Amino acid sequence: MSRLDQKTVANRYARAIFELAQEDGQLDQTYQELVSVRQVFLDNPSLAPLLAGVDLGIKEKQALVDQVKEGASKYVANLLQMAFDYRRMSDMVAIVDEFERRYDEKHKRVHAEVVTAVQLDETRRNQLRDNLAARLGAQEIVLNEKVDPTILGGVVVKTANQTLDGSIKTKIEQIRRLIVK
């Protein structure tokens, strides 16, 4: 029996819980819970290997899973238990990432990494959000801001699908290439 790759596993599990939560009107709650579960795994990088490894017995592993499931809705609790039962705990972050991708697509939400030479103030941040939303056809833009003085000015925006480079550094390089020709 071949082991499925992580992307295939994440797609299947995420699609299943997404469809169930959507049918039951629990999509927003399930999303919030899964983001919290993902954070548990990210904050405790040894958790997934511990649950997948041989250092703990099955009862100790189940006790850890039960702690993560504590307070979770039936969908999230069932997902965690199924991932544990089928030895897919190492895929949990990927499963939540895929669920979030589906959630974002449904809500027309785009995550954008924004690089500027200086920190954006609230006015410029809101202008950038509005411009990106219009350009990308999104209802919501989630910005992950980074400051990099080497771009000299302007802004570089990276989304899952594209990169928009309006940095002064790139414009100078383009002019330099034209002059050298």
UniProtKB/Swiss-Prot annotation:
Belongs to the ATPase delta chain family. It is found in: Cell membrane. F-type ATPases have 2 components, F(1) - the catalytic core - and F(0) - the membrane proton channel. F(1) has five subunits: alpha(3), beta(3), gamma(1), delta(1), epsilon(1). F(0) has three main subunits: a(1), b(2) and c(10-14). The alpha and beta chains form an alternating ring which encloses part of the gamma chain. F(1) is attached to F(0) by a central stalk formed by the gamma and epsilon chains, while a peripheral stalk is formed by the delta and b chains. One of its GO terms (molecular function) is proton-transporting ATP synthase activity, rotational mechanism. The keyword Transmembrane helix does not apply. Pfam families: OSCP. Keywords: ATP synthesis, Cell membrane, CF(1), Hydrogen ion transport, Ion transport, Membrane, Transport. The keyword NADP does not apply. This is ATP synthase subunit delta. The gene is atpH. Its main location: membrane.
